[in-house]
Regions:
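Nucleotide-activated chemistry modules centered on ATP-dependent adenylation/adenylyltransferase
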Residues: 1-201
Length: 201
């Protein structure tokens, strides 16, 4: 008996500097471990509750996702736009997903998805800084790690050469260090059954 979720490793990063505060607790490995114990103790120890994507980062999921362009017009992950099945293109979640995908896609494709180039909007400076800079609290949205954002920005800048939209140009001027690749990332703190691990490698 399996209850399978799709929460990734990135959901474990806390949101408030210096404190273990995570509004995504229900998506974290900590919750997964706690709930598995509860199920075993009080419900049915034959039930396996786990997140299949837990070993992967959200960056790796995005890298895989962009190989399926047929889903670009229909996928959606914006809380504000959920009722209308659109991207509001004005919140931290939209900006985060835009940055993540900008590592792999050109701006023309991204504008078709989001309706505008979010990296060319000066008004998103504060949201941008919260997603990428140490010492800045992350937005209370379901967004990935700052390491993923930095890697995505590094790749996005390389893809675009000298033609950088405002927020990329602003970030490039800080001369950020070259981030570590996540191609081979694998979080071993997971509950994926051994016979399914091969699906993720």
């Amino acid at each position: 008996k399996y209850i399978v979720l799709s929460n990734e490793s990135s959901a474990n990063e806390t949101y408030v500097s210096g404190r273990q505060v995570n509004h995504q607790y229900s998506k974290s490995t900590e919750f997964e471990r706690d709930f598995r114990s509860y199920v075993t103790d009080y419900l049915d120890d034959g039930i396996q509750y786990f997140s299949l994507l837990r070993p992967w980062s959200e960056w790796q999921i995005a890298k895989k996702f962009v190989t399926y362009p047929q889903y670009f017009p229909v996928f959606q992950s914006c809380n504000l736009g959920s009722k209308t099945d659109t991207w509001c293109a004005d919140c931290a979640k939209c900006l985060y997903v835009y940055i993540l995908l900008s590592a792999f896609l050109d701006d023309e494709t991204l504008v078709k998805i989001f309706g505008k180039n979010m990296l060319d909007c000066e008004k998103y400076e504060d949201m941008f800084d919260g997603l990428v800079l140490d010492g800045k609290d992350k937005p209370f949205e379901c967004v990935g790690t700052k390491s993923e954002v930095r890697l995505s920005l590094y790749m996005a800048i390389k893809r675009r050469g000298d033609k950088l939209p405002y927020l990329l140009s602003r970030y490039a001027k800080t001369n950020p260090p070259v981030p570590q690749s996540m191609d081979n990332y694998f979080d071993n703190d997971n509950f994926v059954p051994q016979h399914l691990i091969g699906l993720l490698k």
